[in-house]
Amino acid sequence: MSNFSPREIVSELDRFIIGQKDAKRAVAIALRNRWRRQQLEGQMREEVMPKNILMIGPTGVGKTEISRRLAKLAGAPFVKVEATKFTEVGYVGRDVEQIIRDLVEIAITLVREKRREDVKAKAHLNAEERVLDALVGKTASPATRDSFRKKLRNGEMDDKEIEIEVSDSGASPNFEIPGMPGANIGVLNISDMLGKAMGGRTKTRKTTVKDSYPILINDESDKLLDQDQIVQEALRVSEDEGIVFIDEIDKIAAREGGSGAGVSREGVQRDLLPLVEGTTVATKYGPVKTDHILFITSGAFHVSKPSDLLPELQGRLPIRVELSALTREDFRRILTETEASLIKQYIALMETEEVKLEFSDDAIDALADIAVDLNATVENIGARRLQTVIEKVLDEISFTAPDKAGATFIIDAAYVKEKIGGLAKNTDLSRFIL
């Protein structure tokens, strides 16, 4: 797990997300608290519970983006789900315990990648031996092998085609048993056992020497790793460092005046309660305790209010953060300051066609103005409006770019207004086009 300080986490998030200081601070403190808890000993470590977060704010202001960037920073198992995808236990559909099962799968992948790095050097040597076997056969003399080894290391054999045998980890069928969530457990374990009993299946692949290395290194790494140890480590990492991000939580809040609990509304909230509070979920790798998993939830709360959530669930999301709507200045900064801003993306895309794009300052102002106006008059969809506007402005250039290699286009305010000004003024039209 990464040990960034809260200040470092916030400055890292600042590279990609404009504004929203409160939300960044809240997630930075929550992430740092995971690390602080790891430093504690014994009973106190068990007692410290994560403070779950509820992010409230209109669509397109950075709630989901904060969680995505946080996951990359954390170096911890992270799963993002939409609350609307789940139904109450006992009904057709996914139940919320599937979130934890997915988290464990992600943790196993993470741990395996880390362990593979540790044994990479030895795996590389073993892979080289297998490539030599494929090139000159196992019975070749040491002198022949050495001469081919030199050629291999010099890259002279990179394009030669060889046949290699690799273990076949063909995806085993994953059957859900109706009425028994998570009952695909049995099927997978049976196929695992059959694989072990038969000494593991292998399949032959044709590939070039250069392309065979990554495949063989992975294959050899897995032979050097203890799978049971990986699973045990992954279960521990899931329990201690796991982060679950639940988006669209406002969509499962009971609407005012609505009747009935609703299978995918209040029922899902009731199922989430024990998960957020701390329970034990059965997975095919073993039981996972959710006491120390950090839950970050977010919602726009356009129709419902946070107080429409079940009181018990509200109590389990003690940290509330409001994200503010974006201003004209925010839009300007999104276009110019973020590390992979839309403008930089379009310039890079056009460079592949040898077309040069240049945006003047007044063009950026015009784009920001139009985005703000449309959000105010049509529907507020936050920063996503910029994608719609820029796409419309650059439509002609994108279409004709292959025929204009070597050309330079300067986008200024006049060009923006020419392409989009009329549409933006006509509210009825812009409802459909922008």
From Swiss-Prot:
Compartment list: Cytoplasm
Highest rank taxon of the organism: Bacteria
Binding positions for ATP per the UniProt entry: I18, G60, V61, G62, K63, T64, E65, D247, E312, R384
GO biological process: protein unfolding; proteolysis involved in protein catabolic process
InterPro entries: AAA+_ATPase, ATP-dep_Clp_protease_ClpX, ATPase_AAA_core, Clp_ATPase_C, HslU, P-loop_NTPase
GO MF assignments: ATP binding; ATP hydrolysis activity; peptidase activity; proteasome-activating activity
Keyword list, A-Z: ATP-binding, Chaperone, Cytoplasm, Nucleotide-binding, Stress response
Quaternary assembly: A double ring-shaped homohexamer of HslV is capped on each side by a ring-shaped HslU homohexamer. The assembly of the HslU/HslV complex is dependent on binding of ATP.
Function: ATPase subunit of a proteasome-like degradation complex; this subunit has chaperone activity. The binding of ATP and its subsequent hydrolysis by HslU are essential for unfolding of protein substrates subsequently hydrolyzed by HslV. HslU recognizes the N-terminal part of its protein substrates and unfolds these before they are guided to HslV for hydrolysis.
The protein's name in its UniProt record: ATP-dependent protease ATPase subunit HslU
